[in-house]
Amino acid sequence: MPDAVTAPGNQCDVLARAVASPRALGRGEMAALLSLEGEEEVGALFAAARSVKVAVCGHGVALRGLLEVGNVCEKDCFYCGIRRSNGSVTRYRLGADEIVRLAEAAAAQGYDSLVVQSGEIESEDQTRLVEETLRRIAPLGLGVTLSLGEQSEETYRRWREAGAVRYLLRIETSSEALYGRLHPADHSWARRVECLRALRRCGYQVGTGVMCGLPGQTAEDLADDIRFFADMDVDMIGMGPFIPHPDTPLAGEPMDPKARLLLGLKMIAVTRLYLHDVNIAAATALQALAPDGRERGVLAGANVVMPNVTDVEHRRLYKLYANKPCLDEPSGRCRGCLERRLASIGETIVSGRSGDSLHYRRRMAAKGGEP
């Protein structure tokens, strides 16, 4: 790690510069910050990132109710528990009636934003199901984020016209070489990047993200991931620690929960320092590594949390990684618990379309559009 960052006085200067201006850090500086291990140095990093989060978002956290509508997936990613080759998974796909019922329940619990997530399926049947569901959900007034993987631009456009406002498509890593080692040959990094561009053309608020702690991944790779977020001009970021799933080719990868959690938190912090005004989620995977993982994510600079509003029966079947938390907790109780936990760290829940990222609102204002 470069002395220019790790020396205490110099680290203070680097952090002060990052707090003062977005995109002020070089690749080497970001990699060095991501490599910090000393308690005092890491604490200073988190404090700097939180100061930016508070300046941009206040002491508020936006909630997105997470609705996992199916675990059928055409992809075969080597790290994912619902990959198509995993024969031990009991597969399910919710119909429009079930999805609408769960969306209505989420709205009744006070959610005004919903993330609809499933395994990746490209078919006209899937396109129509999502289209119908979006139109039926529309009267609830929910801001809907879709996370349904790679699709054609026409499909993205149809879903946007049916009422979706945000789309999260995680690139998983900005390194094409690393992506190739984590996926079969028929999976295309370039196509995933093009899908992100298509989403922007269709008018979505666009989100992406990566995993932290992948086999063979370096601090420089993660710094490049953050620069990728900037180059793609994304509005929101969802990223979390890599947690091996026992029924995948990467099941035997070494896992130090404490170190993996710390890396995930540092990635949130450095991303906040570099990009300032985007929405950053404290991933549920953080809670899989520590009971207070999501709160620690907020303290490191995140401003979005996504409580699970899927019914318990299906929530147990949607396991992307090991030790998924809150499998048996009813969604209503989960929200109340989260409110109390956020209050304990000085945060309140933000309601309404103010959940849009400041980055998105600024971009729309610059274009003369409505934020």
Which residues does each PLM region occupy?
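An N-cap/entry alpha-helix motif that binds or orients negatively charged groups
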Residues: 24-61
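Active-site-proximal loop/turn and secondary-structure-junction residues that shape catalytic pockets
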Residues: 67-71, 120-122, 148-152, 173-175, ...
